[in-house]
Amino acid sequence: MPTHHQIVVNGVRLHYVEVGNPQGPLAVLLHGFPEFWRAWERQIEPLARAGFRVVVPDLRGYNLSEKPPGVSAYRVGTLQEDVAALIRALGQGRAHVVGHDWGGIVAWALAIRQPEVVDRLVILNAPHPARARQVARKPAQWRRSWYIFFFQLPWLPERFLHRFGAWALHGTNPQAYTDEDRRLYREAWDQPGAATAMINYYRALRRSRRARRESASGAQVRVPTLVIWGQRDVALLPELADGLDRWVPDLRVVRLPRASHWVMRDEPVRVNNLLVEFLSGALVEASVPT
């Protein structure tokens, strides 16, 4: 069973759960929007059984972690520093980093800016910043990204999250999210200040000059990387997973044609096998057929 902890890193108090061999290789799993640590509940035990020390934080602003005020507290650079500081505070110089959605955006940033703390990188349905800039010009992606523009409004997105957030949690697998899952998610969203903090990620992204410079410069990733992409993502075009070897030389891409954005929920067994194989160094193919 996971144990729950609180730790202060980079000036913010983070809640995290931990399970597995304390002496094993550290694997840090980063959730996305609008989730929290339980996003990875079907991956935690399989990774622990494979010998990893598994640590899963609530990102700043989420669930039981601290919720600093102001949009600037949620810039990608700050989020990336949180994770780097967490890895160091856990007594490790490096860790495997796995990120989905916003957790993937943070994981990309960490691998780009602080590769010395990343051993292996796994990204699930989160765009590399340079590829995102290319695809963002396409009207088809604009239509899918409507919520990013909506989230720039004051107070209204928070109301939307409280009333309709659970609507988004539907994968292609009917068992992706249970009624109990949705109850726990609503409980996390109802933590004081959580809704505004979560939506501030999007507000900060739109205002981040550094993120725009980085996406324009084609930031390189120099660590072994696995990208797992659910092809039935309604928010992100499948082509966001194309052409990544331009920026990521040591790359493997696995496309799951039946999975949605919630890929680790739709196909947990497949994802778990890929994670264990890749993080153990056993997945060597340049691209794994679907």
Region annotations inferred by a language model:
Residues 259-268, 272:
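Catalytic histidine-centered segment of alpha/beta-hydrolase-like enzymes
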Residues 2-5, 12-14, 19, 26, ...:
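Flexible "cap/lid" subdomain of the alpha/beta-hydrolase fold that forms the substrate-access gate
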Residues 18-66:
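Conserved HGGG/HGGXW glycine-rich cap/lid loop of the alpha/beta-hydrolase fold
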Residues 36, 194, 271:
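Short phosphate-engaging motifs
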Residues 282-290:
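Alpha/beta-hydrolase-fold serine-hydrolase catalytic core, especially in secreted/extracellular enzymes
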